[in-house]
Structure formats: C-alpha cells, structure tokens
C-alpha cells in the first residue's frame, strides 16, 4: 500500500474526517508536554534547556498566528474558488516571511536588551522554523478541506506531529 492510498482510501469520508480530526487534536496537544518531558528527563540537573524550550515554544506558537494569519477558515469556505490556490499560497508565503522576520527581530531584541545567549537565540529560531512548516502546510491542508478531504489533511498533520515528537526524542 503506497502513501497516497493510505491517506486517501476510506469508505466514509465524513466519519474518517471526524475521527482523524479528533486524533490530530489529541496528538497536537501532546507535542509540547512530551518534548518537555524528554528534555527534562535527559538532563534533570540542568533545567535551563527546558526553560529555553518553553520560551521558544511559546514564542513560536504566538508567531504561528502571524504565519497562518487566519486564512484557513476563509480558504476552506471558498468552495466556489473565488481565489485560486496559487493566490492563497502566495499570501501564505508572505505571511510566513513576516513570521520569520518577526522571530528574527524578537531574537535580536532578546540578544541586545535581555542578554539572550546564542543558544537561546538559535533554539527560538529553530522552533519558529518548525512552526513555519506547520504554517506553510496549513495552506495545503486548507486546500484539502476545500476539496472535501479534511481526513487527508488531518492524517498528514498527525503524521507531522508524530515526526516532531520522534525527532526530539532521537536528538
């Protein structure tokens, strides 16, 4: 069974969308706590890494709103395709650039005025980069939802969350 078939094959799209949306929400909610547990358990004497991760994750989640800019609801409800996917993609590209520019600005400000270490600077940028992938993939998930295949979008998103958790556990 190939990946395309695994993502798209279902007997009931509505039920599959509902179930996978619920699974995706649960996995999404587990990302930060599980990664934080891994960080604190890997070196319990040095909790600085956990603090840096917490700040980075909080900043990245705030900036994710800028990267997504609330277009998903608008895009998925555009069933008559008044705007093309290329237009949504282009707008998302601009909002993602703004997101990373804001992240860089935040890190520079923190380095100058708050004495952020280079470690904190780069961890914040890396976590923001991780959220950049989420913001960018959201426009593709919006397209899937627009085409009536929310189940494909949520399966993809759930897989990405699992890879995030696994990669942090490995590193």
Language model segments and positions:
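Membrane-interface alpha-helices at helix entry/exit sites of multi-pass transporters
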Residues: 51-52, 82-92
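Signature of the first transmembrane helix
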Residues: 9-69, 100, 126, 130, ...
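N-terminal membrane topogenesis motif
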Residues: 1-31, 80-86, 118-120, 151
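Hydrophobic transmembrane helix module of multi-pass membrane transport proteins
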Residues: 64, 69, 92-171
């Amino acid at each position: 069974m190939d990946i395309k078939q695994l993502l798209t094959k279902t007997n009931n799209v509505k039920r599959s969308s509902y179930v996978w949306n619920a699974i995706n929400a649960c996995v999404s909610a587990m990302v930060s706590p599980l990664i934080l547990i891994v960080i604190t358990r890997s070196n319990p004497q040095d909790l600085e890494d956990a603090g840096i991760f917490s700040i980075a994750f909080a900043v990245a989640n705030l900036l994710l709103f800028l990267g997504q800019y609330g277009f998903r609801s608008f895009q998925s409800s555009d069933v008559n395709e008044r705007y093309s996917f290329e237009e949504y993609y282009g707008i998302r590209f601009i909002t993602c650039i703004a997101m990373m520019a804001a992240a860089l600005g935040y890190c520079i400000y923190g380095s100058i005025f708050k004495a952020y270490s280079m470690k904190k600077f780069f961890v914040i940028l890396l976590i923001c980069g991780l959220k950049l992938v989420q913001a960018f993939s959201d426009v593709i998930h919006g397209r899937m939802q627009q085409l009536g295949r929310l189940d494909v979008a949520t399966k993809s998103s759930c897989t990405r969350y699992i890879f995030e958790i696994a990669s942090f556990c490995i590193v």
